[in-house]
Design a protein with these regions (language model features):
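Bacterial N-terminal signal peptides that target proteins for export
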Residues: 1-8, 17
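Boundary at the C-terminal end of the N-terminal hydrophobic targeting segment
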Residues: 15-17, 22-27
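Alpha/propeptide regions of enzymes that mature by internal proteolysis
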Residues: 24-384
Length: 384
């Protein structure tokens, strides 16, 4: 074998050893495609957070050599300048072992004035700096002297993103996530901020889902996007999948695997005040619990909820956010049901669409769809 062929073979073997391509995610099914359809409400056309009118999502996956597996996910409530056209918002903390930049001002004033960025733990401040620079360059921002950047994170620095200390994202990548944000389908699994994450000791990632509440009490849509990187004992539609597959992270004794975090972003076109958005956000934690999470001591479990309804936005010069309150308690209860269902399914999608990922620090396996099907069938859940 010649030197050139030998070198080519070594390169190919190395590529296989560290196969990090997210392309295989498109070949893995979403939860609903194998019959896992939590709840009673119908999904939107895309079954994604982008079913909520106006919401855009942009993602950049950062994979470098054998030690960087991370990325950025950007969620924009609308396509305009959020600083000049703010939306009502609220944040709920399930367990506060995390870094959610900008959270105190959001809960104090009840509004978002920037897009939401998700990334890895040590990249939060670089992401915020880049987003602020990007926003200051927008038209009408020449006299702005304060911006409350909202950036969430999970810690992917154990096996996959072992170069996390280098804070391996750039301002250009943050700008790319923001400027490439679009409506339509949202890529899931080992992409964007979910590139290096793990959940229930399998490969985690980005997941999304939506629900439409009935026209008799709406019609409104609730969409959820999650970045999963947490522990627990996985349950799917009540079936003890984690126990059946001997993935009992809560009993593993490994803090790195038992702890972790999840970021949950909730969007709705219902014209809710920040007070009612906080009530909506708190129900997302119920969807999280349905999947087997216990919000462990070292977990950062956060929910950011916002409304895209145009008539509840606040312009920068307006004295306060005016909100058309939903006085119908049946409407609110339907929204609560919807967000629980969408959160649960978004978490399943993050697992099902994730692909096995390797780095110099190790390998995190994707959950076996075939084994999940077999377990669900055994527990009376008819998978496709």
């Amino acid at each position: 074998m010649g030197e050139s062929r030998a070198w080519l073979l070594l390169v190919m073997l190395a590529a296989q050893a560290f196969d990090v391509s997210p392309g295989h995610a498109q070949q893995r099914p979403r939860a609903r495609e194998i019959g896992v359809a939590p709840g009673i409400y119908a999904t939107g056309p895309l079954n994604a957070i982008t079913d909520v009118p106006g919401v855009l999502v942009g993602q950049v996956t950062v994979i470098e050599a054998d030690s960087v597996r991370t990325g950025i996910t950007a969620i924009l409530p609308h396509a305009g300048n959020l600083f000049l056209q703010r939306v009502p918002a609220a944040i709920v903390v399930g367990n506060g072992f995390g870094k959610l930049l900008g959270s105190t001002q959001v809960n104090e004033l009840g509004e978002l004035e920037t897009p939401i960025l998700l990334t890895c733990t040590l990249c939060v401040w670089k992401a915020a700096d880049a987003m602020i620079e990007w926003m200051l360059g927008q038209p009408g921002m020449d006299k702005v002297r304060s911006i409350n950047a909202v950036v969430g994170e999970t810690n992917d620095g154990y096996e996959l993103n072992i170069a996390i200390r280098s804070r391996p994202i750039t301002a250009a990548q943050v700008r790319q996530a923001l400027t490439s944000a679009h409506t339509g389908p949202v890529q899931e699994g080992s992409v964007g901020a979910g590139t290096g994450t793990r959940a229930f000791d399998w490969k985690g990632g980005i997941g999304t889902s939506s629900r439409k509440i009935p026209s008799t009490v709406g019609p409104y849509t609730v969409g959820v996007l999650v970045q999963t990187n947490f522990g627990g004992v996985l349950q799917i539609m009540g079936a003890p999948v984690g126990q059946e597959l001997a993935h009992k992270v809560a009993e593993s004794g490994s803090r790195a695997h038992a702890d972790g975090s999840i970021m949950m972003v909730v969007a709705t076109d219902a014209p809710l005040s920040d007070r009612n958005l906080k009530r909506l956000a708190s129900r997302a934690l119920m969807g999280l619990a349905r999947t087997g999470s216990v919000a462990s001591n070292g977990s950062g479990d956060y929910v950011i909820a916002f409304s895209t309804a145009p008539d509840v936005r606040r312009t920068r010069d307006a004295p306060r956010l005016t909100t058309t309150e939903m006085g119908n308690t049946e409407q609110l209860s339907s929204l609560y049901q919807a967000v629980i269902e969408a959160t649960e399914e978004a978490i399943y999608n993050s697992l099902f669409k994730a692909t096995t990922m390797s780095s110099k620090g190790g390998t995190v396996e994707a959950i076996s769809i075939d084994k999940v099907r077999e377990i669900l069938a055994r527990y009376g859940i008819k998978p496709k």
